Every structure is written in C-alpha cells, then in structure tokens.
C-alpha cells in the first residue's frame, strides 16, 4: 500500500475539515461518479472478458484517444507492465502526428489487430479524424468495420449511434464521470483487460485508497494539498518522479492539472502551470 510521509508540520484538522466535508457531500450526492468506479467497474471486467473471449486471433490492440481517454491508460500501462496474463500488445496513439501514426501502423497487421476508438463525448475531432484515417489506410468498407473496431464512449453519443448503425460494439462511460477523471471507467478498464493487465487488482487498490480516506479518515492527502496551496510562491506546480516507469504518469499529471487547475480563473490568468520531471536525469540537468 501507499506510504505517506509528511516533511512539514501538520495543520489542525479544524482548518481543513471544511474541504473534507465538501468532498464527502459530493461523494454521497451521487452526482459525481468517479468516487464509485472501483465498485461499478467490476462488471466491466466481465463484459470485457466476454467481448474478447472468442477473439483469440487478436495479438495487438491500438487505442485511439486524446486527453482523459489516453493519458491515464498510458500511465497504468507503464505501472502494470509486470501484471499481465496474456501476450497482447497495447499501442496508443494520442496525437495527430503523421510520424507517430506511420511508425505505429507499420507494427500492426489488420488481421490480428483490434482498434479501440475512445472518446467520451463521441465528437473529439482528433479521435474521429484518426478513426477515418485508419479506415482509409486499410481500405475498409463499412460492412467490415465491426470485425476490427470497438468504441468507448457515452451512451447515445454520436459515436455510439454510429456504432449501432455499423454494428460496432460500444462500451459506455457513466454520464456523471468527467473525461479527465475516467481512467477507472471503460476508458481504462476495457483496454487493460483485453491486453491482460491486472484490472481487478487495480480496482482493489483504488478501493483501498478510497477506504483509507473516507472510512479510516486518514488525512495525509488533505494535509499535503492544504500545505502546498497555502505555501506556494509561484503559479508553477512541479512533479518530480524518480523512475522511468513514471513517464506516462507524469504526462497524465500535467494533463489533469492543465485541464482543471491550470485554466484561468475568470479573466485573470492565474491558473497553475504544471511541470513534470523524471529524476535523477532531470535533476542532474538543473
């Protein structure tokens, strides 16, 4: 389990209880779904296993996504590299770079590759463009798409509607889960399960963290958040991770902060600027 070490004097709980209370109210309201994904996503594991069961010919999986539909998956792929039960290889394209697309496609064979198109809204322009590019590259007819593609999106989104029309299977993201916080939904669970990563262990770990905070009332995370917020001297937030396995996690951190706290407040450009570094390499160059 995670070990928390604080290198500063803790604040009295009275000073931060209001923040904890707001989070608890939000959790209990049911309006924000990511608090419950460690439970609700267990069914996704079985659904994903059922989907891939008769597709033993699939050796490689290409996930097309942007932002919240890719960053978290990349991080978990790096973390769970030694927690795999099959040999399926997971590739991720999260940019419209022609170089990346070309180099990735060279490694894939249409006959043994499953393409996952992931967009919560179903209208992410970069994802839709890459989807069309894949169809054109492999010269696929509409009638062939259901054999090679699967969608991850909101129920009744335009992507889901297209999937229904073409016979392409769709996994759904809960409506009350925002895209940037969706890694424990179908966004992350489906590709991880299909490629044999230990998704059940991941959800169990998330559940343990949830219980530490909400059930056992451990306050280290709140203490850290409060300290960093009240002691900052600049609008720059630096994450220094020690280990190459954190590269994907660092990218995810930047995406989460930039898309949330990094945005300007009102008309004042005072949002945080996130910077992610890998030690000891980046420390050496400082």
Question: Model segments located where?
Answer:
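Amphipathic coiled-coil/heptad-repeat helices and related helical stalk/stem segments
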Residues: 44-48, 101, 282
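Non-transmembrane, aqueous-exposed alpha-helical and coiled segments at domain scale
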Residues: 10, 142, 262-263
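Extended, charge-enriched "interface" segments that sit outside catalytic cores
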Residues: 1-53
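Acidic catalytic cores of enzymes that act on phosphate-bearing nucleotides/polynucleotides
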Residues: 30-33, 51, 197-201, 211-286
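Glycine-rich phosphate-binding loops that contact phosphosugars or nucleotide phosphates
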Residues: 53-214
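Short, flexible loop segments at the rims of nucleotide/cofactor-binding pockets, characterized by
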Residues: 38-44, 91-94, 215-217, 275-276
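Flexible, active-site-adjacent loop/turn segments at secondary-structure boundaries
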Residues: 33-35, 69, 91, 99, ...
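Glycine-/proline-rich flexible loop or hinge segments
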Residues: 30-38, 58-62, 282
